[in-house]
Amino acid sequence: MGVTLEGQRKESIWVLMRRQRARRALVKKIMIRPRKSVEASRRPCRAIHRRVKTLKELVPNTKTSEGLDGLFRQTADYILALEMKVKVMQTMVQVLTETNCV
């Protein structure tokens, strides 16, 4: 630090730059969230892949489906087919119970 003619302190440019750098580091530390590790960012992806794999095991003939769109379409078709089978079975039960009672 130097002294001017008027007796006031004159700070060196290097001291000012060091303070500014320290302030920036502090602001950066406060304002920017720490980044998650690569492993943490892959966890949701792994969970999705595990669920897709489970869905492929549950729905028949999905090994050859084209992407998630095809898998979801085949799953929806499979659910509709199962619903129709349930309705047919319910109708058969009603018909058979009515004929046995009469």
Curated annotation (Swiss-Prot):
It is found in: Nucleus. Disruption phenotype: Enlargment of the meristem and longer root length. Residues 32-82 form the bHLH domain. Induction: Up-regulated by reactive oxygen species. The keyword Isomerase does not apply. GO terms for cellular component: nucleus. Keywords: Differentiation, DNA-binding, Nucleus, Transcription, Transcription regulation. Expressed in the root vascular tissue and in root hairs and lateral root caps. Detected at the protein level in all cell files in the elongation zone. One of its GO terms (biological process) is regulation of DNA-templated transcription. InterPro entries: bHLH_AtIBH1-like (IPR044549), bHLH_dom (IPR011598), IBH1-like (IPR044660). GO terms for molecular function: DNA-binding transcription factor activity; protein dimerization activity; transcription cis-regulatory region binding. Transcription factor that modulates the balance between cellular proliferation and differentiation in root growth. Does not act through cytokinin and auxin signaling, but by repressing peroxidase expression in the elongation zone. Homodimer. This is Transcription factor UPBEAT1. It comes from Arabidopsis thaliana (Mouse-ear cress). The gene is UPB1.
